[in-house]
Amino acid sequence: MNFSAVILAAGKGTRMYSNKPKVLHTLAGKPMAKHVIDTCEGLGAKNIHLVYGHGGDQMQAELGQERVTWVLQAEQLGTGHAVNQASPEFSDDEKVLILYGDVPLISTATVENLLDAQPTGGIALLTVVLDNPMGYGRIIRRNGPVIAIVEQKDATEEQKLIKEINTGVMVATGGDLKRWLAALKNENAQGEYYLTDIIAAAHDEGRAVEAVHPVSPIEVEGVNDRAQLARLERAYQAAQAQKLLEQGVMLRDPSRFDLRGSLQCGMDIEIDVNVIIEGNVTLGDNVVIGAGCVLKDCEIDDNTIIRPYSVIEGATVGEKCTVGPFTRLRPGAELCNDAHVGNFVEVKNVRLGEGSKANHLTYLGDAEIGKRVNVGAGVITCNYDGANKFKTIIGDDVFVGSDSQLIAPVTIGNGATIGAGSTVTKDVAENELMISRAKERRIEHWQRPTKK
């Protein structure tokens, strides 16, 4: 579809009581403006013009990688003035879609309907009917067709009774829009250039104005304060949870589940309460996720159990694995099939072989660990000397006793045994027992120190 988009994002957001621009506050882990940008990109917008004002440096630092044209509105003189800053970029014959960076939930379906509804030479306008329209511009109709929009502060008492309100989202042709914007005046209670005045201008020219309703009213709710943002967050999460339930995912309590990215699921998935999904997560068949887990950018294969309060980021977990409770898998962690990682174990940049176990109180970093290895409680791969990192290599069928330190770089051969409490600084051969302990010393009739 041949259209360009303008996203208005210049507002300061005073009621957020924040040092950053309002549209950078996140919903589902993503800046509100990014939600709107993604909607435009999903529909194939030819150009996306982002109109910014306050906090320009922060805006570009956060959204600088996006495919947008940056348009500065140095003075905030109204919505019409804001769109007009981008108007030199409009092609005369293209559709121009106007959206808002603080209205993050607008859907592709609603935008498609709006684009399709634009009459030739006219305007398609997104409206909604509210029980309490206080604060919004009212839609003025004459015998059916829309003829104008009147803002709350300029409305008569009779007009204030109207419940159909303007969302601000609209579509017009670029050439017409440029002409109407250039003719705007600021003769109103706010002293601003209202975008909504182009509706009356179009009507005066005999152009049709087509009103379209959103798929869901929540889509057009804006954010002015943190309470409104929290409300939209819950609405968004409820919708995501409902989709997963309909796809066969068992959410034990849909109201206590947060999806802040994308989730690909197999069959018979079970997710307990207070689980957070971030980035891109893939779950195979029959995966169970315990309460309080955080999963980010990870893949978990079939028949694996993630026990409560585990944090998994940038990791790959094979089939029939058990993780947790209270496990941390960091980027580069790879658990092969039937591996087990237990409570208070941290794993980073490690391949843990098939059937291997590290069940208690262990740090494994920068290591290659073979099959059927048993890593005892309190084992540490000492991978960092204060300047550089080094690798530990452990062969198949190795037993590493509790409270051992493996000082990298070091290699432990297949079938070797490391006695509990050992510090390993040199390579250990296959099937070798390595043990290093200080000689025990005993003092009879020992007297403990007493307080003075």
UniProtKB/Swiss-Prot annotation:
Is the Transmembrane keyword given for this protein?
no
Query: Its pathway?
Result: Nucleotide-sugar biosynthesis; UDP-N-acetyl-alpha-D-glucosamine biosynthesis; N-acetyl-alpha-D-glucosamine 1-phosphate from alpha-D-glucosamine 6-phosphate (route II): step 2/2; Nucleotide-sugar biosynthesis; UDP-N-acetyl-alpha-D-glucosamine biosynthesis; UDP-N-acetyl-alpha-D-glucosamine from N-acetyl-alpha-D-glucosamine 1-phosphate: step 1/1; Bacterial outer membrane biogenesis; LPS lipid A biosynthesis
The reaction(s) annotated as catalysed by this protein in its Swiss-Prot or TrEMBL entry are: alpha-D-glucosamine 1-phosphate + acetyl-CoA = N-acetyl-alpha-D-glucosamine 1-phosphate + CoA + H(+); N-acetyl-alpha-D-glucosamine 1-phosphate + UTP + H(+) = UDP-N-acetyl-alpha-D-glucosamine + diphosphate
Question: Which key words tag this protein in UniProt?
Answer: Acyltransferase, Cell shape, Cell wall biogenesis/degradation, Cytoplasm, Magnesium, Metal-binding, Multifunctional enzyme, Nucleotidyltransferase, Peptidoglycan synthesis, Repeat, Transferase
Q: Which cysteines are joined by disulfide bonds?
A: none
Give GO MF terms, alphabetically.
glucosamine-1-phosphate N-acetyltransferase activity; magnesium ion binding; UDP-N-acetylglucosamine diphosphorylase activity
Q: For the region Linker, what residue ranges are annotated?
A: 227-247
Protein residues bound to acetyl-CoA:
A377, N383, Y384, S402, A420, R437
Q: Where does UDP-N-acetyl-alpha-D-glucosamine bind?
A: 8-11, 22, 73, 78-79, 100-102, 137, 151, 166, 224, 330, 348, 363, 374
Which InterPro entries does this one have? Answer: Bifunctional_GlmU, GlmU-like, GlmU_C_LbH, Hexapep, Hexapep_transf_CS, MobA-like_NTP_Trfase, Nucleotide-diphossugar_trans, Trimer_LpxA-like_sf
UniProt superkingdom: Bacteria
Q: Where is this region: N-acetyltransferase?
A: 248-452
Annotated residues that bind Mg(2+) are located at: D102, N224
Q: Name one GO biological process term.
A: lipid A biosynthetic process
Q: What is its EC number?
A: 2.7.7.23, 2.3.1.157
Broadest EC class?
transferase
Query: Where do the catalytic residues lie?
Result: H360
Cellular compartments annotated: Cytoplasm
For the keyword Transferase, the answer is: yes
- Which CDD domains does the record cross-reference, listed alphabetically? GT2_GlmU_N_bac (cd02540), LbH_GlmU_C (cd03353)
Q: What is the annotated role of this protein in its UniProt record?
A: Catalyzes the last two sequential reactions in the de novo biosynthetic pathway for UDP-N-acetylglucosamine (UDP-GlcNAc). The C-terminal domain catalyzes the transfer of acetyl group from acetyl coenzyme A to glucosamine-1-phosphate (GlcN-1-P) to produce N-acetylglucosamine-1-phosphate (GlcNAc-1-P), which is converted into UDP-GlcNAc by the transfer of uridine 5-monophosphate (from uridine 5-triphosphate), a reaction catalyzed by the N-terminal domain.
Kindly state the subunit structure of this protein. Homotrimer.
Q: What's the name of the protein?
A: Bifunctional protein GlmU
